[in-house]
């Protein structure tokens, strides 16, 4: 993930309200505000940098016998903190 205003996480897909809760809590913890010390673009962009730094931009997974090993209640989510906009992502597979 080459972006500084996006993140990647694993979260449960079972209840869609859970993603709303996650989004609400991220916004509560790191609100968009005009008094960030680094204001290179917009307040939303500045908040996006902080959110991305705290939540992370990469996740490691295990692939076993050609299958992605996720728990039954796990899905991969891309988190957009300064958009929508076009994004790219990269996948790297390496052996043990």
Q: Where do the PLM segments sit?
A:
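Active-site histidine-anchored catalytic micro-motif
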Residues: 1-96
């Amino acid at each position: 993930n080459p972006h500084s205003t996006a993140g990647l996480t694993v979260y449960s897909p079972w209840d869609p309200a859970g993603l709303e809760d996650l989004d609400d809590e991220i916004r509560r913890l790191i609100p968009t505000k005009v008094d960030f010390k680094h204001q290179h673009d917009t307040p939303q962009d500045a908040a996006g940098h902080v959110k991305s730094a705290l939540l992370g931009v990469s996740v490691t997974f295990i692939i076993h016998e050609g299958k992605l090993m996720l728990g039954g209640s796990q899905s991969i989510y891309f988190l957009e903190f300064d958009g929508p906009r076009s994004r790219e992502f990269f996948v790297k597979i390496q052996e043990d």
